[in-house]
Protein backbone atom coordinates (compact mmCIF):
# COMPACT_ATOMS: atom_id res chain seq x y z
CA UNK A 1 0.00 0.00 0.00
CA UNK A 2 1.38 3.47 -0.85
CA UNK A 3 2.37 5.91 1.86
CA UNK A 4 -0.84 7.56 3.09
CA UNK A 5 -0.90 10.86 4.98
CA UNK A 6 -3.97 11.50 7.11
CA UNK A 7 -4.47 15.16 8.16
CA UNK A 8 -4.31 14.42 11.88
CA UNK A 9 -1.87 16.12 14.24
CA UNK A 10 -2.15 14.54 17.68
CA UNK A 11 -1.76 16.70 20.75
CA UNK A 12 1.10 15.88 23.15
CA UNK A 13 -1.14 13.77 25.41
CA UNK A 14 -2.64 11.97 22.42
CA UNK A 15 0.84 11.07 21.15
CA UNK A 16 1.61 9.46 24.50
CA UNK A 17 -1.73 7.64 24.51
CA UNK A 18 -1.25 6.30 20.96
CA UNK A 19 2.06 4.73 22.05
CA UNK A 20 0.60 3.31 25.26
CA UNK A 21 -2.52 1.92 23.61
CA UNK A 22 -0.35 -0.08 21.21
CA UNK A 23 1.32 -1.83 24.14
CA UNK A 24 -1.84 -3.32 25.63
CA UNK A 25 -4.75 -5.50 24.60
CA UNK A 26 -7.23 -3.35 26.54
CA UNK A 27 -6.94 0.35 27.28
CA UNK A 28 -9.12 2.69 29.30
CA UNK A 29 -8.67 6.44 28.90
CA UNK A 30 -10.40 8.70 31.40
CA UNK A 31 -10.16 12.17 29.92
CA UNK A 32 -11.98 15.49 30.17
CA UNK A 33 -14.75 16.51 27.76
CA UNK A 34 -12.63 18.35 25.21
CA UNK A 35 -9.52 16.15 25.27
CA UNK A 36 -10.05 14.93 21.71
CA UNK A 37 -10.88 11.33 22.60
CA UNK A 38 -13.07 10.67 19.58
CA UNK A 39 -10.64 12.13 17.04
CA UNK A 40 -7.76 10.25 18.66
CA UNK A 41 -9.66 6.95 18.68
CA UNK A 42 -10.87 7.31 15.09
CA UNK A 43 -7.35 7.97 13.87
CA UNK A 44 -5.87 5.16 15.95
CA UNK A 45 -8.46 2.78 14.55
CA UNK A 46 -7.83 4.02 11.00
CA UNK A 47 -4.10 3.37 11.34
CA UNK A 48 -4.74 -0.08 12.82
CA UNK A 49 -7.18 -0.94 10.03
CA UNK A 50 -4.82 0.22 7.28
CA UNK A 51 -1.79 -1.60 8.68
CA UNK A 52 -3.54 -4.83 9.69
CA UNK A 53 -2.08 -7.65 7.55
CA UNK A 54 -5.20 -9.83 7.94
CA UNK A 55 -7.65 -10.29 5.11
CA UNK A 56 -10.57 -7.83 5.46
CA UNK A 57 -10.08 -6.74 9.10
CA UNK A 58 -13.15 -5.40 10.91
CA UNK A 59 -13.30 -2.52 13.38
CA UNK A 60 -16.22 -0.99 15.27
CA UNK A 61 -16.86 2.33 16.96
CA UNK A 62 -19.51 1.41 19.55
CA UNK A 63 -21.69 4.13 21.08
CA UNK A 64 -24.53 3.68 23.55
CA UNK A 65 -26.95 4.46 20.69
CA UNK A 66 -26.34 4.34 16.93
CA UNK A 67 -27.60 7.91 16.30
CA UNK A 68 -25.22 9.11 19.01
CA UNK A 69 -22.31 7.38 17.24
CA UNK A 70 -23.36 8.97 13.98
CA UNK A 71 -23.48 12.40 15.60
CA UNK A 72 -20.14 12.09 17.40
CA UNK A 73 -17.91 10.00 15.13
CA UNK A 74 -19.23 9.61 11.58
CA UNK A 75 -18.12 13.02 10.32
CA UNK A 76 -14.63 12.43 11.74
CA UNK A 77 -14.39 9.04 10.05
CA UNK A 78 -15.36 10.64 6.74
CA UNK A 79 -13.02 13.59 7.29
CA UNK A 80 -9.92 11.51 7.97
CA UNK A 81 -10.60 8.35 5.93
CA UNK A 82 -11.88 10.45 3.03
CA UNK A 83 -8.29 11.49 2.31
CA UNK A 84 -7.37 7.87 1.56
CA UNK A 85 -7.70 7.07 -2.16
CA UNK A 86 -10.19 4.29 -2.86
CA UNK A 87 -12.11 4.65 0.40
CA UNK A 88 -15.88 4.20 0.13
CA UNK A 89 -18.59 5.21 2.57
CA UNK A 90 -21.98 3.60 3.09
CA UNK A 91 -24.15 6.26 4.73
CA UNK A 92 -27.08 3.98 5.57
CA UNK A 93 -24.86 1.41 7.31
CA UNK A 94 -22.45 4.01 8.77
CA UNK A 95 -19.60 2.00 7.30
CA UNK A 96 -16.22 2.97 5.90
CA UNK A 97 -14.62 0.51 3.47
CA UNK A 98 -10.88 1.05 3.12
CA UNK A 99 -8.92 0.13 -0.03
CA UNK A 100 -7.12 -2.77 1.71
CA UNK A 101 -10.47 -4.46 2.51
CA UNK A 102 -10.60 -3.22 6.10
CA UNK A 103 -13.94 -1.94 7.35
CA UNK A 104 -14.88 0.48 10.13
CA UNK A 105 -18.52 0.55 11.22
CA UNK A 106 -20.41 2.62 13.76
CA UNK A 107 -22.75 0.51 15.88
CA UNK A 108 -25.05 1.23 18.80
CA UNK A 109 -25.01 -0.83 21.99
CA UNK A 110 -28.78 -0.48 22.45
CA UNK A 111 -29.29 -3.77 20.60
CA UNK A 112 -26.71 -5.98 22.29
CA UNK A 113 -28.13 -9.11 20.64
CA UNK A 114 -27.20 -7.75 17.22
CA UNK A 115 -23.55 -7.24 18.13
CA UNK A 116 -22.93 -10.55 19.89
CA UNK A 117 -20.77 -12.97 18.01
CA UNK A 118 -19.44 -10.55 15.42
CA UNK A 119 -15.78 -11.05 14.62
CA UNK A 120 -13.77 -7.91 15.28
CA UNK A 121 -10.14 -6.95 14.99
CA UNK A 122 -10.62 -3.83 17.07
CA UNK A 123 -13.27 -1.84 18.85
CA UNK A 124 -13.64 1.58 20.44
CA UNK A 125 -16.30 1.85 23.14
CA UNK A 126 -17.51 5.44 23.44
CA UNK A 127 -19.36 6.80 26.48
CA UNK A 128 -18.94 3.49 28.29
CA UNK A 129 -20.80 4.70 31.35
CA UNK A 130 -23.98 4.53 29.23
CA UNK A 131 -23.37 1.03 27.80
CA UNK A 132 -24.70 -2.11 29.50
CA UNK A 133 -21.93 -3.70 31.58
CA UNK A 134 -22.52 -7.06 29.87
CA UNK A 135 -21.44 -5.74 26.47
CA UNK A 136 -17.73 -5.75 27.26
CA UNK A 137 -17.37 -9.37 28.37
CA UNK A 138 -19.74 -10.65 25.69
CA UNK A 139 -18.36 -8.68 22.76
CA UNK A 140 -14.94 -7.20 23.35
CA UNK A 141 -13.27 -9.93 25.34
CA UNK A 142 -13.98 -12.42 22.56
CA UNK A 143 -12.35 -10.21 19.97
CA UNK A 144 -8.94 -11.49 18.88
CA UNK A 145 -5.87 -9.97 20.43
CA UNK A 146 -5.51 -6.97 18.16
CA UNK A 147 -7.23 -4.02 19.87
CA UNK A 148 -10.02 -2.60 22.06
CA UNK A 149 -10.34 0.84 23.62
CA UNK A 150 -12.68 2.26 26.26
CA UNK A 151 -13.08 5.98 26.52
CA UNK A 152 -14.42 7.23 29.82
CA UNK A 153 -16.13 9.41 29.01
CA UNK A 154 -14.75 7.09 26.75
CA UNK A 155 -11.98 4.21 25.00
CA UNK A 156 -11.54 0.22 24.96
CA UNK A 157 -8.94 -1.96 23.19
CA UNK A 158 -9.26 -5.64 22.15
Predicted regions and their residues:
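Phosphate/NTP-binding elements of NTP-utilizing enzymes
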Residues: 1-152, 157
